[in-house]
Amino acid sequence: MNNEKSLSCIILCGGMSRRMGEDKGSMKIQDKPMILYILDTLNHMINEVVIVLNDERRVSKYSAIINQYQKNNKPFDFTITYVKDEIQNKGPLSGILTGLKNISTDYGLILPCDSPYIKKEYINTMINTLENLND
């Protein structure tokens, strides 16, 4: 399996932010939004990212954050698609459904937007597990 061309990542960013009071994926750690840590980790590992958000305002916000970051840094080597939850306010399962409907590969790794310290080793473990299932 060529992991660069056969795996997508769905990042769930559609939470209501009731407990935090603000959108978690755009919250900054050391002046860098959490979503960017995840995208940096995924670079050179997958073919596409589908970011699932809950409204058009967040689509614009995330698009601006990511576009500005790529303008100031090396661009990501995967495509990024922004989609709105098909079923609003029903939790992460509706985000997963929306994400799976919008990937172009057979498999999608699902990550929450508030996991900035996800390691490449974890992604590799998931890819290797998938490869073993397909052997």
Predicted regions located by residue number:
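Nucleotide and nucleotide-moiety/phosphate-recognizing core
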Residues: 2-135
